[in-house]
């Protein structure tokens, strides 16, 4: 049994619908998020991700279906819910002349319970920037401040909308470490991202949306295995061989030739590689070069939506 299935459900979305005039932004969406997991919501632009998150957060009213977050109805109990969740939005912008510690104290005053400002400054590496104006912060420092503001009320769940957009690889890794720390503390994280490798690294489970509907749900590994994409093999041989002979090797899904190399998709790859070695020995042929690439969440995304993730 999946370990998450043994944990309490923190977010329940059942048959959710939301329309904007004649446009159905969300159509019959259902999923659960378990306590303590990092849950990724993926989809191309216009898939309905933002609308779904806004409904979960209590910012929009659904037209149909049932949503519960921390046991509360976001549409009817939004004030109570705000005490229990934190949200870091991509467009977080503070006044240019607001200092870091002022922002934290301001946000702390919005809640009945709040974390220590000093502890937040220490935790997010902002202690030396406490008196710095927002306009003087780097992109990475602004993102760390946004995360600190999302945790100012010690929430059970954090909603992160594109938390690493625009950051260089090292700063993205710093944010990854913070998100992994959230999970180690038992917090639930709902994450949207345009970086497939980010979802594959951070998320316990992901939901892929397209045109307002759920098209895939599971752990990254489950989705990759379930997709039947197969492992990609690129090989160069001592002597040419006909594609029709490669296609009948055990486990080969399809193959093609380009620029003197043979490209195979195989499932399971171990069976195909063993059969390939036997085939080459019998044919008095040999491998000159072999590259193996396992399928990725990007492959699943393209298969499900017909589009690549917009970075």
Identify the function of each model-found stretch.
Residues 176-267:
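ABC transporter nucleotide-binding domain
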Residues 253-311:
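Non-catalytic connector elements of ABC transporters
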Residues 8-11, 18-210, 214-216:
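ABC transporter nucleotide-binding domains
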Residues 18, 31, 124, 233-237, ...:
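Preference for bulky hydrophobic residues occupying beta-strand positions
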Residues 1-17, 307-311:
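ABC-family P-loop ATPase nucleotide-binding domain
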Residues 86, 108, 112, 207, ...:
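A generic structural signal for secondary-structure junctions
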